Every structure is written in structure tokens, then in C-alpha cells.
Amino acid sequence: MQPRSKHTGMSENGNDKRDGDDGQTGVVIKTRPKTKKPSMYKVLMLNDDYTPMEFVVHVLERFFNKSREDATRVMLHVHTRGVGICGVYTYEVAETKVTQVMDLARQNQHPLQCTIEKE
């Protein structure tokens, strides 16, 4: 007669079964991290009494890819209202455009100013 064995939670092969693992495999579902859209920034041009209107139109055409008509419209808006939107971009692009405008204005000895504002 064999002695009665106590249940130890061990399977025949010695693996511990007490943790609820029945040896079956499961499927791991990978979720894609949600990507957040970057914040957008307006590049604003400020009016001054010294920068020639034609220079402002040139800047808008060159750095903001405006047509002559659109550039003239923005320039007149800046001239009459004191400030106008040149375009809306991600921060890095907006910052680059402001730097390009300010550098060209300085090279041509114009006090033209541009700033960035979060949309």
C-alpha cells in the first residue's frame, strides 16, 4: 500500500500550478501610442513707418510663398491694422521664418518686425 500524497500544488513535471497559469499562451495586443498633433504658431508681421511696402511684399512672396496678390493683401492689412498673419506653422518652422525675415530686413536696413504667437 502506498502512502497517500498530499497535494502540494506541483504538477507531475514539477512546475508550480498555484499561480493560476494553466500553461496556455495568450495574445498580447500592442496598442499604438496616440500621437498628438503639434501645436501651431502664427507668424505675425508688425507695421512700422519705415519699411517700404514693396519690401514687405517681397518678403511675403519669398518666405511665405504668397502670390503677388496675396502678398499685397497681407501687406495692406498690416499697414492699415498694425499687424497681420503671414502664415501658421509648427514652432520650428515659424521660428525659422521669423529669423529669415528679420535677417533680410536687417541686411537691407529696415526695422521690419515679425513675431510668433501660439494659435
From Swiss-Prot:
Known function: Involved in the modulation of the specificity of the ClpAP-mediated ATP-dependent protein degradation.
Region (Disordered): 1-34
Quaternary context: Binds to the N-terminal domain of the chaperone ClpA.
InterPro entries: ClpS, ClpS_core, Ribosomal_bL12_C/ClpS-like
Superkingdom classification of source: Bacteria
Entry-linked HAMAP family: ClpS
Name the UniProt record assigns to this protein: ATP-dependent Clp protease adapter protein ClpS
Parts forming coiled coils: none
GO aspect biological process, one term: protein catabolic process
Gene3D superfamilies on file: 3.30.1390.10
Family named by the database record: Belongs to the ClpS family.
